[in-house]
């Protein structure tokens, strides 16, 4: 198992771990616009997209499409899982932000690798 796959596995466990924190135990921001958590979701899932791309996209045919679909699916799973945690609620916009994050992370990694490998 390569280093990126190990990091991906640990990062997935980290996402699940954070999703397991009950809502009342989550830290509150000093100020809130009401949408900044979508930015956090995009950043969180961009890292997931980067690690998934580095782990699998050189080895699997149609891997980019599979990566994006898997990222959206994991985001959906994560939101459904959160519905089982006290004080946490699923949100369709979080799933969309997760999917955008995975897509942006993997696309940016693809192009950065092309630029720096050529």
Write out the residue ranges for each language-model feature.
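"…centered on the first transmembrane helix and the immediately adjacent amphipathic helix/loop
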Residues: 1-54, 67
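Membrane-interface helix-boundary motifs at transmembrane edges
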Residues: 1-3, 56-62, 115-118
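Small-polar-interrupted transmembrane alpha-helices in polytopic inner-membrane proteins
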Residues: 10-19, 66-83, 99
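Helix-loop junctions at the membrane-solvent interface of multi-pass transporters
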Residues: 18-21, 56, 84-85, 107, ...
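Interfacial helix-loop-helix junctions of multi-pass membrane proteins
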Residues: 28-34, 77-100
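Membrane-interfacial alpha-helical segments at the cytosolic side of multi-pass membrane proteins
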Residues: 44-59, 101-113
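Post-HEXXH active-site segment of zinc metalloproteases
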Residues: 52-72
């Amino acid at each position: 198992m390569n280093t990126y796959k190990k990091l991906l596995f640990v990062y997935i466990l980290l996402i699940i771990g954070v999703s397991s924190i009950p809502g009342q135990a989550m830290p509150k921001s000093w100020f809130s616009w009401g949408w900044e958590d979508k930015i956090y979701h995009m950043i969180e899932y961009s890292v997931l997209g980067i690690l998934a791309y580095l782990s699998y996209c050189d080895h699997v045919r149609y891997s980019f499409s599979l990566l994006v679909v898997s990222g959206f699916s994991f985001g959906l799973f994560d939101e459904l899982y959160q519905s089982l945690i006290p004080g946490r609620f699923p949100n369709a916009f979080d799933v969309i932000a997760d999917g955008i994050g995975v897509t942006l992370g993997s696309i940016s990694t693809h192009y950065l690798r092309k630029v720096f490998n050529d």
